[in-house]
Amino acid sequence: KALLDAKEANYLLKEYFPFSTFSPYVEIFLKVTGGMQKSGLLEVLKALQLAIGQEENKKNMVRSRKNDREKQEQLSRYIKSLFIASPSLLVIDLDVSYADEWDYNQPLKMLPESTDQKVQTEESVRRGRIEKVQRERNELITQLKKKYKRDLVGYIWKLDYSIEKNFHYNMIYFLDGEKYQNDIEIADSIGKLWTSVTEAKGIYFSKNLHKYNGVGLIKHDEIEKRKSLESNVLYLVKTEYFVKMKLKSESGQKLHTFDRGQIPKRGQSKRSQVYTI
């Protein structure tokens, strides 16, 4: 019964995640069940088993898991490089997004259903909003670099979209912990800067204010705190295995939906001892 009900999720997933692709398993499920709305359970199970066993699908599954592992390893190395560069880091973790009334779907609701005008307007509004979301993120990071200069040791961001949460970013910033300790105030100031950059359309949630694990001041030898931080960061990658944003510019160029700062140069290191986790 649950499997047959899940066939109805085909439409809902595409509606709720219009800019996303899914894990190979979900993609196979959607493709197989998309044309089997009137089929029985046994027919669906046989079709799924056959599809999963196909060589091309097997390769896609292996490739997807490999890419996921490589991303996790890259981020793990990045975090370790930041602690090599700085004896302590002030970790700022924010979710930034847009108020409901600024969801790009709002103007589309005023259009008549099933018209060429709606299709064209949807695409135009979608492209315009994507570019705006990208510009506003770039502007936020640019202003933070100007303010903190080299004390902004690193950062990680990920862009997502769903109907419920609109466009939203997970952002983690790493400041020099020897110079900055007041993480709650700094997180709030970055959130307010986001509101300013978005012309009061943006909202934010501070994980520092709510004292999540893996945020605030973390010294290079505080292994448990570092494990919590790494767990938070790697979670962003793990969720991409199931639902991953894919965006393109008007020219068709692929746009980043996940990025990090540069690995600090060896000459920037402020200490020689390296702690492993």
Which sequence ranges carry the predicted segments?
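Histidine-centered divalent-metal-coordination microenvironment in nucleic-acid enzymes
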Residues: 154-178
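Charge-rich, solvent-exposed alpha-helical interaction surfaces
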Residues: 2, 12, 25, 44-47, ...
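A short, flexible beta-alpha/helix-coil linker loop
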Residues: 99-103, 174-179
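Eukaryotic intrinsically disordered, low-complexity regions enriched in serine, threonine, and proline
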Residues: 46-61
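Structured loops at beta-to-helix junctions and adjacent beta-edge loops in soluble globular domains
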Residues: 95-97, 160, 239
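Catalytic "initiation/cleavage/transfer" segments centered on a nucleophilic residue
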Residues: 17, 21-41, 57-85, 109-115, ...
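Long, charge-dense tracts
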Residues: 1-22
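Signature for HUH/AEP ssDNA processing cores
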Residues: 76-156
